[in-house]
């Protein structure tokens, strides 16, 4: 179960149901992904060796070989779909609460000096050019001063994307 900290967006029943569905689908796909090893060992690698008389010379060759495999194609398409579903399900939560979230963050930051941002640092072009994790505007976009909606969207979605594997606060990563 996901935990809610002080600036986590409030959710309604249907939103939680959508999140739970996507989290469980991602959990299932984590098991399905294990078949990619078999697809590589049984089909992609032998086919490549038969055609080229050698093993892979680069990760690009390996990627091209795997992209031809039906199991990998199915897993990849489903994984992409869950990312799109996650964005559709999650974006409305922080956006309908954007002003309230901004106020909560401002109140916390007012009494804490734990985060100091440098206004002179600009987002690099390579980050501006891409919507990371399919999130429109990525992590850096502000619709108004102090906007934290995209950060809140990412925060809530991380639990769903990882199917809770990072813990209830998404802070349990272990190498």
Task: Please provide the spans of the model-predicted regions.
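Conserved SAM-binding loop and adjacent beta-strand
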Residues: 143-153, 158-175
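N-terminal auxiliary segments of SAM/dcSAM-dependent transferases
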Residues: 2-148
């Amino acid at each position: 179960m996901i935990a809610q900290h002080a600036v986590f967006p409030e959710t309604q029943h249907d939103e939680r149901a959508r999140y739970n569905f996507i989290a469980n689908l991602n959990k299932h796909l984590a098991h399905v992904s294990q078949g990619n090893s078999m697809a590589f060992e049984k089909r992609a690698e032998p086919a490549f060796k038969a055609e080229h008389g050698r093993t892979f010379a680069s990760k690009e060759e390996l990627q091209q070989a795997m992209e031809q495999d039906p199991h990998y194609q199915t897993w990849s398409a489903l994984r992409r779909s869950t990312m799109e579903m996650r964005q559709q399900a999650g974006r409305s939560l922080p956006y309908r609460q954007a002003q309230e979230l901004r106020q909560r963050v401002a109140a916390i930051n007012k009494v804490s000096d734990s985060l100091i941002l440098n206004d002179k640092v600009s987002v690099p072009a390579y980050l501006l050019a891409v919507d990371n994790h399919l999130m429109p505007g990525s992590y850096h976009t502000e619709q108004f001063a102090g906007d934290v909606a995209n950060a809140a969207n990412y925060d809530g979605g991380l639990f769903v994307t990882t199917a809770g594997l990072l813990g209830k606060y998404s802070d349990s990563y272990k190498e």
